[in-house]
């Protein structure tokens, strides 16, 4: 990944690497949940929410690969995935889950939300870095 990003500012490279690692971690989590649960990891969730979480087994690695390749589509997909994941986790942990107080899911939701906000803060820099590469590749 570093070769494609070597001309980007250090902070932007760090944000890109961190986002790729978060997306890779998300991929592992969703694949493990799918494997351990025998194909139905979220039986208590509404169908639309189960479908969304299952789709992350494809969307997380796709966003990571596109972002690692310094593609603007990777930035857009990573933002869409992480922001929607924060919203979906909020729904699952605060609307669907009737438990009062702190739960592991609610702590996880808070962490996903912090990561999504961090990515939103980094998005302008990531966007500029991917735009400059796009301009360079069209001039060749």
Regions found by a protein language model. Give the residues of each.
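Topology signature of small-to-medium multi-pass alpha-helical membrane proteins
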Residues: 1-140
């Amino acid at each position: 990944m570093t070769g494609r990003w070597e001309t980007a500012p250090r902070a932007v490279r760090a944000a890109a690497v961190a986002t790729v690692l978060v997306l890779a971690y998300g991929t592992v989590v969703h694949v493990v949940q799918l494997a351990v649960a025998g194909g139905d990891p979220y039986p208590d969730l509404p169908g639309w929410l189960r479908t969304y979480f299952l789709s992350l087994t494809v969307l997380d690695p796709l966003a990571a690969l596109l972002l690692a390749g310094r593609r603007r589509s990777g930035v857009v997909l990573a933002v869409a995935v992480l922001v929607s994941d924060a919203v979906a986790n909020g729904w699952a942990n605060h609307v669907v889950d009737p438990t009062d107080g702190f739960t592991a899911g609610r702590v996880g939701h808070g962490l996903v939300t912090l990561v999504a906000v961090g990515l939103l803060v980094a998005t302008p820099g990531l966007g500029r870095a991917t735009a400059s590469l796009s301009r360079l590749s069209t001039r060749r």
